[in-house]
Amino acid sequence: METLAQHRHARSSAQKVRLVADLIRGKKVSQALDILTYTNKKAAVFVKKVLESAIANAEHNDGADIDDLKVAKIFVDEGPSMKRIMPRAKGRADRILKRTSHITVVVSDR
C-alpha cells in the first residue's frame, strides 16, 4: 500500500530540490535516509523530513513494516514565488524571485 507525505512552500527552488530527489527515487527507505544524511545540500534536510514523515504515516496509519518500505514516487513541483526588490545603482531596481517548491514523497511496501 502507498502512503504519502508532503511539504508545501519549502523555501528552496524546485530545480535544487530535484537534484536531491533524484538520488533516492526507487531506493529502500533505510538506504535513502543514509544518503540524505550525508548529502551536503540544504534541500536534503527538506527531503529527509518529508521522507521521515511518510515513513511515520505508513507505520501509524497503515501498520506497515519499515524494513519493507521503499520510495515508490518522489516529485517536486514549483510553488508560488515571492517577489522582492533589490535596489541598484542610479535609482534602478531589480526584481528578485524567492522561489518555493512543493515536495511529495510516496512510500510503498511493494
Curated annotation (Swiss-Prot):
Any one Gene Ontology BP term: translation
Annotated Gene Ontology cellular component terms: cytosolic large ribosomal subunit
Keyword Transcription regulation: no
CDD domains per record: Ribosomal_L22
Keywords on record: Ribonucleoprotein, Ribosomal protein, RNA-binding, rRNA-binding
Source domain of life: Bacteria
NCBIfam families: rplV_bact
Cited function: This protein binds specifically to 23S rRNA; its binding is stimulated by other ribosomal proteins, e.g. L4, L17, and L20. It is important during the early stages of 50S assembly. It makes multiple contacts with different domains of the 23S rRNA in the assembled 50S subunit and ribosome. The globular domain of the protein is located near the polypeptide exit tunnel on the outside of the subunit, while an extended beta-hairpin is found that lines the wall of the exit tunnel in the center of the 70S ribosome.
Protein name, UniProt field: Large ribosomal subunit protein uL22
Organism (species): Enterobacter sp. (strain 638)
Name of the gene encoding the protein in the UniProt record: rplV
